[in-house]
Design a protein with these regions (language model features):
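Helix-to-loop junction immediately C-terminal to a conserved catalytic motif
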Residues: 17
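A position-specific signal in ABC ATPase nucleotide-binding domains
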Residues: 20-21, 28, 74
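ATP-binding Walker
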Residues: 7
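Conserved ABC transporter NBD signature motif
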Residues: 25-37
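Conserved coupling/switch loops of ABC nucleotide-binding domains, chiefly the family-specific signature
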Residues: 23-26, 182
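ABC ATPase nucleotide-binding domain helices that frame the ATP-binding cleft
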Residues: 10-13, 115
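ABC ATPase nucleotide-binding domains
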Residues: 49-51, 55, 59-197
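The feature captures the beta-strand-to-loop junction immediately N-terminal to the Walker
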Residues: 2-4
């Protein structure tokens, strides 16, 4: 989702996540109904199996990097061995295994976003929702993280809904772009077609 600040990107993402109510219509992922105003149906966020990464570095400073990533798994009915496996795998895939015992406060901004990404990855999501996750990083780190996000998506095959106001970020990361302005969808197309039109 691409558009200027205040155009409704984050609100739309929050509706997809289940954090906001719909005014009308419905939300589906594939054939799975998530929300429907007409049918008065609402699937709670914890049952949607979505990984979420916010713009702010959403990490718990009183927990280690490992515990930050393992935390959502501990809320599910998952064995200790499975929690350890998934957490270790997520840390490995985000290049955080060597800092697993450190505090997130010991990491750079990019490191903190990797922790949030690893936490979202550990739940084996059907869809990843990313709300301007790179906007507070310096340009060099932002570009590096773009490649990492794209590589993770290709490796695991989950869909990503990515919110940004940065056109180059949208062009580099997307298979399809939805352009928004003043709360309305202006265009949905491939990056190339949007660039050419």
């Amino acid at each position: 989702m691409l558009g200027p600040s205040g155009c409704g990107k984050t609100t739309t993402l929050r509706m997809i996540a289940g954090f906001e109510d719909l005014d009308g219509g419905e939300i589906k992922v594939g054939d799975k109904l998530l929300s429907s105003k007409k049918n008065n149906f609402y699937l709670p966020p914890e049952k949607r199996n979505f990984g979420m990464v916010f713009q702010a570095f959403a990490v718990w400073p009183h927990m280690t990097v490992y515990d930050n990533v393992a935390f959502p798994l501990k809320l599910k009915n998952i064995s200790a061995q499975e929690i350890e496996k998934r957490t270790t795998d997520a840390l490995r895939h985000t290049n955080l295994l060597s800092v697993a015992k450190k505090s997130p406060d010991d990491l750079s901004g990019g490191g903190k976003q990797r922790v949030a990404l690893a936490r979202a990855l550990a739940i084996n999501p059907d869809v990843m929702l990313l709300d301007e996750p790179l906007s507070s990083l310096d340009p060099h780190l932002r570009e590096e993280m773009r490649f990492e996000i794209k590589a993770l998506q290709k490796k695991f095959g989950f869909s990503i809904i990515y919110v940004t106001h940065d056109q180059s970020e949208a062009m580099a990361l997307s298979d399809r772009i939805m352009v928004m302005k003043k709360g309305a969808v202006q265009q949905i197309d491939t990056p190339l077609n949007i660039y050419n039109n």
